[in-house]
C-alpha cells in the first residue's frame, strides 16, 4: 500500500510541474519575438522598452497555480527574471567596449610618458601650426650635475651677448675659432719639407689656446725667408766635352767645325760627360770605316804597337 501511494504521489507532482515548464518556454519565445521585431537602438539611447511587460497569450490557470494539497501559494511567471538577465547581458556588452577603450587610453598615456623623456628633441610639437612654444628649453637646466665644457659655456655667452665679438675685433684682440684645435708646433724643423709646411698660429697669451692671429707684414716676410725654396740639382746641365789634362784641343778651321784636323774623322762624343751630380757615362765607341786605321794605332816611328796580319806577311816575304 505504501509503495502504491508513493508512486501515485510522484505522478501527481510530475503532472503539476509540466504546465510550469511549458509556461517558461512560451515566455522566452515571446521575449525573443519582441526583441527581433523591435527597431535597433543606440547603446546610449532610451531603453525603457525593456521594462515594459510583454503580453503573451496564456491559457486559463497559467498565471495562478494552486497545489493539490490546498495551500494558497501563488507562482508568477518568470518574465521579470528574464528581463533582468537580458538587461545585465546588455549592460555587460556595453560596458566591455568602454572598459577596453579606457584601458587603451591608459596604455597610450603610459607609452607617451615612457618615451617622452628619451625623444624630447626629436618629438614633433603639437602646436607648430600656430607658431606656439614647442616646449623645448633653449637653455636646459643641468639636472644630472655633469660638468659642462668651457666651449659650450663660451658659445652660450657669445650668443647672449653678440656685441662682445665686435668689441674684441675693434680692440684688436684675437678672435677664437669655435670648435677648432690648435695646430701642432713643429719647432725649428718647420721647413724640413721644402717649404710646404704651414706655420702654426701662435697667441700672445699663454693661457689662451686654439687662437689664430692675423699675421703682420714683418711676420709674413720672416716666414717667406724661412720657407724659401732651396736650389735643387734636379735640372740637367748642357753636355760639354771633358778636357783631358796635358792635351789641347786644336783651333777651329774651315775644314772641320768640330775642331779635328782634316785627315782625322770628326770627333764623336767619346769623352766622359760629367754633369753636376750625375755619374760619368762613357758613350759607346764608334768603329772606324773598313780600310782605314785609327790614328792611335799609327805611332810616330811608323811601327805598329800591336802586331797584326801585316807584320806576319812582311816576315814571310823577307
Swiss-Prot record:
Where are the Phosphoserine modifications? Answer: 68, 125, 192, 249, 257, 260
Stretches of Basic and acidic residues bias are at 7-20, 83-101, 150-168
The alphabetical list of record keywords is: Phosphoprotein
Q: Is the keyword Methyltransferase assigned to this protein?
A: no
Disulphide connectivity of cysteines: none
Q: Where is the signal peptide?
A: none
Protein name per its UniProtKB record: Protein W
What is the scientific name of the source organism? Sendai virus (strain Z)
UniProt lists the gene as P/V/C
Amino acid at each position: 500500500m505504501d509503495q502504491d501511494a508513493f508512486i501515485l504521489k510522484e505522478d501527481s507532482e510530475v503532472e503539476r510541474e509540466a504546465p510550469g515548464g511549458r509556461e517558461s518556454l512560451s515566455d522566452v519565445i515571446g521575449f525573443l519575438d519582441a526583441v527581433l521585431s523591435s527597431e535597433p537602438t543606440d547603446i546610449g539611447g532610451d531603453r525603457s522598452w525593456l521594462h515594459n511587460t510583454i503580453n503573451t497569450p496564456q491559457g486559463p490557470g497559467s498565471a495562478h497555480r494552486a497545489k493539490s494539497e490546498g495551500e494558497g501559494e501563488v507562482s508568477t511567471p518568470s518574465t521579470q527574471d528574464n528581463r533582468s538577465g537580458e538587461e545585465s547581458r546588455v549592460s555587460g556588452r556595453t560596458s566591455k567596449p568602454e572598459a577596453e577603450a579606457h584601458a587603451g587610453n591608459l596604455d597610450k598615456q603610459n607609452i607617451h610618458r615612457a618615451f617622452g623623456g628619451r625623444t624630447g628633441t626629436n618629438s614633433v610639437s603639437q602646436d607648430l601650426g600656430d607658431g606656439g612654444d614647442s616646449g623645448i628649453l633653449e637653455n636646459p637646466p643641468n639636472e644630472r650635475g655633469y660638468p659642462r665644457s668651457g666651449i659650450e659655456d663660451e658659445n652660450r655667452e657669445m650668443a647672449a651677448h653678440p656685441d662682445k665679438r665686435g668689441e674684441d675685433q675693434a680692440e684688436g684682440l684675437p678672435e677664437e675659432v669655435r670648435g677648432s684645435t690648435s695646430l701642432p708646433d713643429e719647432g725649428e724643423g718647420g721647413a724640413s719639407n721644402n717649404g710646404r709646411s704651414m706655420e702654426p698660429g701662435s697667441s700672445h697669451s699663454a693661457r689662451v689656446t686654439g687662437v689664430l692671429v692675423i699675421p703682420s707684414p714683418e711676420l709674413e716676410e720672416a716666414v717667406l725667408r724661412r720657407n724659401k725654396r732651396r736650389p735643387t740639382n734636379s735640372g740637367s746641365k748642357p753636355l760639354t766635352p771633358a778636357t783631358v789634362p796635358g792635351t789641347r784641343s786644336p783651333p777651329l778651321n774651315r775644314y772641320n767645325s768640330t775642331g779635328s784636323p782634316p785627315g782625322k774623322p770628326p770627333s764623336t762624343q767619346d769623352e766622359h760627360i760629367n754633369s753636376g751630380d750625375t755619374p760619368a757615362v762613357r758613350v759607346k765607341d764608334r768603329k772606324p770605316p773598313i780600310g782605314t786605321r785609327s790614328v792611335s794605332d799609327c805611332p810616330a816611328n811608323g811601327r805598329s804597337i800591336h802586331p797584326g796580319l801585316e807584320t806576319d806577311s812582311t816576315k814571310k816575304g823577307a
